[in-house]
Amino acid sequence: TAERGSAARAEWRNRLEAHGDKAEFERRMAGDLPESFSLDTYIQSLIDEPQKVATRKASEMTLGEINANLPDTIGGSADLTGSNNTKAGGIGPFTADDRSGRYIYYGIREFGMAAAMNGMALHGGVIPYGGTFLVFTDYCRAAIRLSALQQARVVYVMTHDSIGLGEDGPTHQPIEHIQSLRMIPNLLVMRPADTVETAECWDIALREKDRPTVLALTRQGLPQLRTEAASENLSGRGAYRLKAAESPRRVILIATGSEVSLATECAAELEKAGIGADVVSMVCTQLFDEQDDAYKAELLPDVSPDETLRVSIEAGTTFGWDRYTMTKGLRIGIDRFGASAPAGDLFEKFGFTADAIVPQIMNKLNG
């Protein structure tokens, strides 16, 4: 058996050495991206032409660029392709009759999809990504945990990330899910706020060879907040100052995803009252936690709440946010199940408006 195996391997090595695609094969098996691959030009095009779209749509737009220029990707969805926006860039389905396809229709098999992607990532040569609703991560959590444990580069495209999905109601509206996923070691959980952050998050996920990524994406459209070019991938630091206070700073608003634009509205109202407010986009808590102490202190100075009040805003559980707001800070969130109604009505009902949040901040400052 050993002799046969040795002979077969030698024959395979000889074929590989003579093959014209040897370098490409070895690059892909090593998990390296092509040297020419970059999303910089695409991101600049987003900055040049701002648009209001859901981040699930922003992800589809980015995937159009990725799949057209990176042959390593193989996508799919657990029976929600049209909702997850995961099929883009001209890729066709992978079938028994056509194995050149790069898209898999997994059916209603969330755990099977996640487990299959783990296998593909561990084999090497491809970068698998797959989509479902964020609330359905409960169905594939064990496989997501193994992605992290086995250091597998898998990208989970999890859409409909909050009460913003609307009428499907509390069975489909994530509350505790984002924070519970953040608790898994070696798993990046990213919640981008607009088209630019979404593209940045995809770029990070593709370059993370030894850990998986969850992209938490909206159903509802979001305004584009990033309209100026940056010298680096700002999302790569996990969090960054999107807006600096104009008046003397009294408040730091820390928000994620769809609530970042709300934080900018709150900041504008506070400024009218002479209260300066920074807006920090917390794209990925894990990446932020990995930054050096100097950067973290620059963004979240270690001063008393009497000097600077920290406020977190996320349309999910408030559990865990005291890590960033400190115990005397203010945490805006949802600690109950959602409801069935249009997204705008739900955000108003659950207090996710500047009119509801700013008075809470003022009371805290004056308390």
Locate predicted features:
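Conserved acidic/glycine
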Residues: 1-109, 119, 252, 256, ...
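General beta-strand structural signal in soluble alpha/beta enzymes
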Residues: 76-77, 106, 129-130, 156-158, ...
